[in-house]
């Protein structure tokens, strides 16, 4: 079965990442879903941005956690709110992969509560998967709303002396009752994918822009590929 194609931060190869323009482009080229990152402003508004500060995307020194939503408004469409994003695309029946970004334990509960509230307000439980690299955050999602699907995200271990084994990855995902795993492409080993599927986990792989991954994903049984260039990946599918 062909994998779903999910636009990483929208169609970020064609438009600025995590902007409405990037998400519209992903939809225009036929992506099956969009992936985006969510952080919390100082006044508790979930906004769509990957980095903790505006330095890379807007060349400004401010941290998102130090700004209010109104203070972000002059940036035009650079940083949309989660509410705005869900409002615009709730009728598209897209898969929405919402990656929670929190820099401290203190941010965890308010960010998860605010995000889950909006998911419910927009009646998007069937379309949204909430992912995070921080496993305790996924536990909080489950506690707040057990019906919202979650994905345990895994990147390559920083230390090669302690690589992430298949057993460790699956054990961590199961420990937080995750619905899915999102694997760095170098972790997408045949045995791991097979074990994840046997455990009933949905499997996504990130971030891949090489069209040869389409056939690899089909052969391995990978459910979705997260890509910066959904147009190129869809052309190969």
List each language-model region with its residue ranges:
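Phosphate-group recognition and catalysis centered on beta-loop-alpha active-site segments
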Residues: 1-237
